[in-house]
């Protein structure tokens, strides 16, 4: 079984179906809520950076690279190579300030002496791609998430001069909380299919 971004969606829909709405909402809104969500779930599949304090443990599953993309009105930028300073000249879409992804990009921009100041903040990662397709700005997306739209030429990849650090998909669980048989089996299946 391949580990990919669909696990997050699977967890979310299973949680919603089984009425685990508090856990699904806590994870969907903001990764810093992992600790709170662990009160209601056996494990979570999230992206780094993840704030994981004892007794929580994390297992790295799969690396991923994020790329800069824009709608088709930004096609000309696809043949250029932009610095992060130049990216700031265009409207930018990101996740909200309370998310770990925002904090990650804020630190990337700060390391280049820049402030991250997005024009549009999305509540969830799956809202970003439609906003890009609606020409609301540029955004950083995981390459696997952007790939289908890139192939269909619905969006364009914009090369960067500055390197964006690789991130990881990881599984977070409470090492002091016993899991049921089904959760343990699913966790083992996910972990055995990593990388």
Q: Predicted regions: what is each one?
A:
Residues 53-92:
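Flexible hinge/capping segments at coil-to-helix
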Residues 30-33, 37:
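Residues within the DNA-recognition helix of helix-turn-helix
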Residues 14-28:
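Short helix-boundary/capping micro-motifs
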Residues 14, 87, 130-136, 171:
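Hydrophobic residues within well-ordered alpha-helices
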Residues 156-195:
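A late-sequence structural motif
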Residues 57-67, 152-165:
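Short beta-strand->loop
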Residues 77, 91-112, 179-183, 187:
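Secondary-structure junction motif
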Residues 47, 104-156:
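Hydrophobic hinge/microswitch elements
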């Amino acid at each position: 079984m391949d580990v990919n971004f669909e696990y997050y969606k699977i967890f979310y829909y299973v949680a919603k179906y089984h009425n685990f709405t508090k856990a699904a909402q806590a994870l969907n809104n903001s990764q810093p809520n992992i600790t709170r969500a662990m009160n209601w779930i056996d494990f979570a599949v999230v992206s780094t950076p993840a704030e994981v304090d004892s007794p929580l443990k994390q297992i790295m599953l799969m690396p991923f690279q994020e790329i800069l993309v824009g709608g088709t009105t930004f096609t000309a930028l696809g043949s250029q190579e932009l610095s992060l300073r130049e990216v700031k000249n265009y409207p930018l879409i990101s996740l909200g300030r309370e998310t770990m992804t925002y904090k990650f990009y804020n630190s990337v921009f700060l390391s280049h002496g820049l402030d991250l100041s997005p024009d549009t903040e999305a509540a969830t990662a799956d809202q970003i791609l439609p906003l890009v397709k609606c020409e609301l700005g540029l955004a950083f997306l995981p390459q696997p998430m952007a790939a289908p739209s890139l192939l269909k030429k619905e969006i364009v990849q914009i090369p960067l001069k500055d390197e964006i650090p690789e991130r990881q998909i990881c599984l977070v669980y409470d090492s002091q909380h016993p899991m049921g048989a089904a959760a343990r089996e699913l966790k083992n299946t996910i972990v055995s299919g990593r990388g």
